[in-house]
A protein has these predicted regions:
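Copper-binding active sites and cupredoxin-like electron-transfer domains
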Residues: 1-244
Length: 244
């Protein structure tokens, strides 16, 4: 029985540098006695249970994998990361849905979907960050700061249980570290994307002109409005082949 709740990394206890690359590493989530809607046994660690996400950061040096496949030695002092993964996926697969049929061995998406904070939905989302790689990864949730509740399976609290959680614009997840962060979206400007909401206010997209096409984050809309079926014969410039 686990002695305390939190977010933990499990890994091989022998030849870690090699076996980590071979996939002998993972996440272990221990629930508190308060229930599934709490990160720790603290009332102020409450979150929305349907908005709990995990981001496990890992790395791949393809030369190590080739050496293992060919049963050849590998000098770990020459280690060089070639690929960075979130939940075992590289972009654009990292934003594919949970349980995507073409990713049978990587079932978890890295794309967090959250609802607007309001009276009917008062609690934030919880993102559990785990870094099983060799370098630090600074994270920033666009649009809002994240509140760091705990690190390495321990709540941020003082000797008398006082709340020591803090907000960060960018939080750095170090190698071998876990970090529990809450995130919320307050729809101050009423950019509501729910068609059933009384505040529904999509900005329509438009067909861009090829001569005015700019490579970069130009989506044809100030925000992603309503998804449409796309244009006949359209060659998309976005990863998912969608038109908004």
């Amino acid at each position: 029985t686990a002695g305390k709740p939190g977010t933990f990394i499990y890994r091989s206890g022998t030849d870690y540098e090699l076996q980590n690359q071979m996939g002998l590493v993972g996440a272990l989530i221990v629930r508190p006695a308060l229930g599934a809607g709490f990160a720790y046994n603290r009332a102020d660690s409450r979150f929305t249970p349907d908005e709990e996400f995990m981001l496990m950061i890992s790395e791949v040096d393809s030369d190590i994998h080739l050496a293992v496949e060919l049963d050849e030695p590998y000098d770990l002092t020459t280690y060089r990361t070639r690929y960075w993964l979130l939940n075992g996926r590289a972009f654009p697969d990292s934003i594919a849905p949970n349980g995507a049929s073409w990713l049978p061995n990587q079932p978890y998406s890295a794309l967090a979907h959250v609802q607007v904070i309001n009276a009917a939905h008062p609690y934030p989302a919880l993102v559990r960050h785990l870094n099983v790689g060799t370098v630090s990864h600074p994270f920033h949730p666009h649009g809002e700061n994240g509140r760091v509740l705990g690190r390495d399976g321990r709540p941020l609290e003082g000797p008398a249980g006082q709340d020591l959680s803090y907000e960060e614009f960018v939080f750095d997840v170090g190698p071998g570290q876990t970090m529990d962060v809450t995130w919320k979206f307050a729809d101050i400007e009423q950019w509501d994307g729910d068609p059933n909401s009384p505040n529904y206010n999509p900005v329509p997209g438009y067909e861009y002109q090829k001569q005015n096409l700019v490579r970069g984050e130009l989506f044809g809309s100030p925000y992603l409005g309503q998804q449409d079926g796309g244009l006949t014969g359209e060659v998309s410039f976005n990863a998912c082949g969608e038109f908004y």
